[in-house]
């Protein structure tokens, strides 16, 4: 097991030569505490994150904050394959009555509730044939209940 604390600061200055309305500046910090637990057949990481960004879009100032939790895990099927799961839940707010935040703020997350679930399965059916599948779910201000599935069989020569 492992406990990790991370903190980073960022400054992003985007200048547009085409439209001045696209010029923006974002400064802030992101904090994350995570706990990792590795077993013989599985890996798990639980984390809590918190961030604050402030900046300017043309002449409008904003302050945004976000808090969330994340779980990432992987379960191994011996030498045959594994299944991975990533679950991310966050709540983000704009505190200065500005209607939106630039895409550089809060690590690209939208305002409001953000839910993202990603699963993937990799499995060797035989030594030379494998199956891969991923299932993804996203629900936020941009994508309302977006659900995708992708899979493939592979043959190795």
Regions found by a protein language model. Give the residues of each.
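Exposed, low-structure sequence patches enriched in small/polar residues
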Residues: 1-157
């Amino acid at each position: 097991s492992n406990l990790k604390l991370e903190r980073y600061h960022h400054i992003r200055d985007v200048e547009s030569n085409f439209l001045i309305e696209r010029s923006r500046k974002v400064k802030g910090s992101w904090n994350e505490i995570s706990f990792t637990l590795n077993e013989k057949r599985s890996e798990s990481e639980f984390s809590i994150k918190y961030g604050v960004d402030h900046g300017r879009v043309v002449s409008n100032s904003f302050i945004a904050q976000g808090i969330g939790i994340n779980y990432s895990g992987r379960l191994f099927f011996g030498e045959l394959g594994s299944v991975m799961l990533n679950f991310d839940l966050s709540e983000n707010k704009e505190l200065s009555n500005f209607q939106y935040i630039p895409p550089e703020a809060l690590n690209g997350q939208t305002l409001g509730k953000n839910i993202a679930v990603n699963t993937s399965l990799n499995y060797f059916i035989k030594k030379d044939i494998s199956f891969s599948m991923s299932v993804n779910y996203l629900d936020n201000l941009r994508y309302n209940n977006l659900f995708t599935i992708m899979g493939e069989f592979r043959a190795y020569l």
